[in-house]
Regions:
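Structural core segment of the AMP-binding/adenylate-forming
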Residues: 52-53, 83-142
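Short amphipathic alpha-helical surface micro-motifs
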Residues: 7-10, 16, 44-45, 120-133
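Conserved AMP-binding/adenylate-forming core of the ANL superfamily
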Residues: 2, 6, 11, 15, ...
Length: 142
């Protein structure tokens, strides 16, 4: 059977896989292993977080994180909430990320703490501080 007819949507595929494959291993991220059922629950929590933060169908939700279990859950959760996904390159500096966030009008950002020795949160705060002081970030003012 064609997947698009069976599941209809990506969220439908996630729910179907959680039901169909349950405790079968779905994702391995370092030492962390999760089943399809666990992945489905993570996706539902991320979707609920989007909705609780005011995300509506068609809103943009950004993710600034490396490929990981958390990225998968956040991305599928955002899509499940009806959002348009805005993935940010992990090599971006704070100003570049701030520029993409502003241009995309992202309503919500899923962000990792630190990756490759860089604190993404601190990087964004520095960019916001420069913009508040009248400076610019890559691509223009924020």
């Amino acid at each position: 059977m064609r997947g698009d007819l069976e599941w209809g949507t990506i969220p439908g595929l996630v729910r179907s896989a959680a039901r169909r494959y349950g405790e079968v291993e779905a994702v391995v991220d370092g030492r962390t292993r999760v089943s399809y059922a666990e992945l489905g629950a993570r996706v539902e929590r991320a979707a609920a977080a989007c909705v609780a933060n005011g995300v509506r169908v068609g809103d943009r939700v950004a993710i600034w994180a490396p490929n990981s279990l958390d990225w998968i859950g956040a991305a599928l959760g955002a899509v499940s909430a009806g959002a348009v996904l805005v993935p940010l390159n992990t090599r971006f500096k704070g100003g570049e990320a701030a520029d993409v966030l502003a241009r995309s009008r992202a309503k919500l950002l899923f962000i990792t703490g630190t990756f490759l020795g860089t604190s993404y949160v601190a990087s964004l705060r520095r960019a916001a501080g420069r913009a508040a002081a009248g400076g610019t970030v890559a691509g223009g003012a924020v």
